Amino acid sequence: MLIPLGLLGVLGLGLAGWSAYVGRKAEEMVPAEGKFAEVPGAHLHYVELNPEAEGPAIVMVHGLMGQLRNFSHSLAGLLAADHRVILIDRPGWGHSQLVGPRPGIAAQAGMIAVLIEQLGLEKPLLVGHSMGGAVSLALALDRPQLVRGLALIAPLTQIVETVPAPFKGLLAPLALRPLLAWTVAVPVGVRTGPATAAAIFAPDPVPADFALAGGGALAVRPKSYMAGSFEIRAAPAEMAGLVARYGEIKVPVAILYGREDAVLDPQLNGEKTAAEIPGATLELIDGGHMLPVTHPEATEAWLRRLLTPPAAR
């Protein structure tokens, strides 16, 4: 019995060492490129584009297993021509570091609210993609005075009973997360990464440069597995609390969905939510879940319409 246990120990140490190596290499390939802000509970990494722009500021919040390059890959530069654009790595994601307990949706919203205040942003448009949409909704409910409105792209807005297929591997019990994160999660992620990305982007193709220019490589780290597993497990209860308060939302809310989204249901997370939030609008376009990457021009045009006063349209 001692020999097999010893072999398991050696194997585990080997996997942990290799996982750490892969994580370091990913961070070398996709390095931090912005600034860090100290907020309660986290060191937030963010990138600021065109800080002197005269147009309304835009704050962009990425989704599950993502990071700020999901926006800078294709979309943010288009908007930065005449807007101050701030891209944020959510707490625990990308290059943002936690300095306290892992935060849920509402706590992340609170941290981003502090960053908005620290940067002196005057009612920015808050753009949330996927899980970032849920965080944006929480911020609008708790700190509505900070934002001019929400622009939600393929957002998580409802209780999702069945975890989307690309993320089922994140369904780890709390007690097993560290073990899985530092042993099997990284090698499995490296092996299945292309297929997982294809499923998330479907029916749109995955850009050849997404791993680097889009930050995709950072998803294959122990840190990312831990964060993703936590959010997948915590989401149903947290979304129940948000959904119950949708009638309280006072800021303008616009939702954009791809008709062929293979990750989140546009009818549930788009149509149902637009009917529940006072004055909310929904627009559907051709495409899948990763619209900021795969359909940047259409997404930009939609965002610019939201930023243009009705009388000027």
Where are these regions (language model features)?
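Conserved alpha/beta-hydrolase catalytic His-Asp/Glu region
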Residues: K25-A26, P164-A165, A185-E248
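Acidic catalytic loop of the alpha/beta-hydrolase fold
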Residues: A234-P236, E260-L264, M290
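Catalytic active-site module of serine/aspartate enzymes centered on a nucleophile-bearing elbow/loop
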Residues: A280-R313
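Short beta-strand/loop motif that positions the catalytic acidic residue
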Residues: I249, I255-Y257
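Alpha/beta-hydrolase fold catalytic core
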Residues: M1-P56, A81-H83, E122, T308-R313
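Conserved HGGG/HGGXW glycine-rich cap/lid loop of the alpha/beta-hydrolase fold
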Residues: E48-H95
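Active-site loop/oxyanion-hole signature of alpha/beta-hydrolase fold enzymes
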Residues: V47-N50, L87-V127, V163, A301
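Conserved hydrolase catalytic core segment
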Residues: E122-V163
